[in-house]
């Protein structure tokens, strides 16, 4: 019994010799994990096939919100998108099936997918899952009968349809007040907005499913004189555990240099649903 007592007394000082180690180890564990979260919160993935406009956008995101952008082609996408705070897609030409599936899976798994400009366009009709996932149809036929039409080199107005939403309001300075009447409204309203020149407009998107309309467009066709006021220039919708945001503008770097539009894109990136 005496020997056991000696062993116990020898061991006791060992347990108390380094009382400071436990908090140090805890702090080290915390610091090891902290940079990973900060990195994820401050980096976005931009997948594009036209890069000058995205370089302008990346510069805006860095300057305004200290967000770092990784810009890649769809063939060079990381295998795992989940670490990015948002994935922005700016694809004019064909959207490959692997990228299509990756974007959809990212959003449904809890990611924030931001679909820009011509990532909704007639060429994407060939994709099996893209338009059904987005709840978008681009009808064929003449525009006067409701068919989809794109026109570039135009001047158009963009108006705020969601005066209480973070994406359309946070730090956004709308320089104009624009008369606008939505198709489902009996009355014309004056809404805050901005004008884009030498841009591109998409007419007659047909939307289905639940979403919040963010932006409307107002455009006069120079060839026919017809005035269009439509409500699909920006929207946000739930996608599984995540979200999908669409912004129609972005024809060229010039659109992303517009302060109001650049701020709206930045808001979409930092928005926390």
Residues of each region from the PLM?
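Bacterial N-terminal signal peptides
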Residues: 26-37
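Positively charged n-region of N-terminal signal peptides that target proteins for export
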Residues: 2-3, 21-24
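Short, Lys/Arg-enriched N-terminal segments with co-localized hydrophobic residues
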Residues: 15-20
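Helical hinge/lid and interdomain linker segments adjacent to catalytic or ligand-binding clefts
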Residues: 42-125
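Extracellular ligand-binding/catalytic regions of CAZymes and related secreted enzymes
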Residues: 41-43, 52-53, 208, 218-273
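A glycine-rich, often tryptophan-bearing local segment used as a flexible ligand/cofactor-contacting loop or short
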Residues: 94-181
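Catalytic beta-strand/loop cores that center a nucleophilic Ser/Cys/Thr
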Residues: 55-64, 148-240
């Amino acid at each position: 019994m005496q020997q056991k007592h000696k062993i116990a007394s020898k061991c006791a000082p060992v347990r108390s010799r380094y009382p400071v180690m436990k908090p140090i180890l805890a702090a080290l564990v915390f610091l090891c994990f902290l940079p990973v979260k900060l990195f994820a919160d401050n980096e976005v993935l931009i997948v594009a096939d036209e890069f000058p406009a995205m370089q302008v956008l990346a510069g805006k995101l860095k300057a305004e919100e200290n967000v770092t952008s990784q810009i890649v082609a769809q063939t060079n996408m990381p295998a795992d998108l989940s670490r990015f705070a948002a994935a922005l897609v700016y694809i004019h030409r064909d959207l490959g099936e692997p990228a299509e599936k990756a974007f959809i899976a990212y959003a449904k798994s809890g990611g924030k997918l931001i679909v820009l400009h011509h990532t909704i366009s007639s060429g994407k009709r060939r994709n099996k899952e893209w338009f059904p996932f987005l709840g978008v149809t681009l009808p064929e036929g003449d525009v006067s009968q409701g068919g989809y039409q794109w026109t570039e080199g135009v001047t158009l107005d963009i108006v705020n349809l969601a005066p209480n939403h973070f994406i359309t309001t946070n730090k956004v300075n709308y320089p104009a007040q624009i008369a606008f009447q939505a198709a489902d409204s009996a009355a014309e309203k004056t809404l805050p907005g901005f004008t884009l020149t030498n841009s591109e407009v998409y007419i007659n998107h047909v939307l289905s499913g639940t979403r919040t309309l963010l932006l409307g467009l107002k455009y006069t066709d120079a060839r026919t004189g017809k005035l269009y006021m439509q409500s699909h220039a920006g929207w946000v919708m739930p996608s599984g555990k995540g979200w999908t945001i669409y912004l129609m503008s972005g024809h060229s770097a010039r659109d992303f240099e517009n302060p109001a539009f650049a701020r709206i894109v930045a808001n979409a990136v930092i928005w926390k649903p």
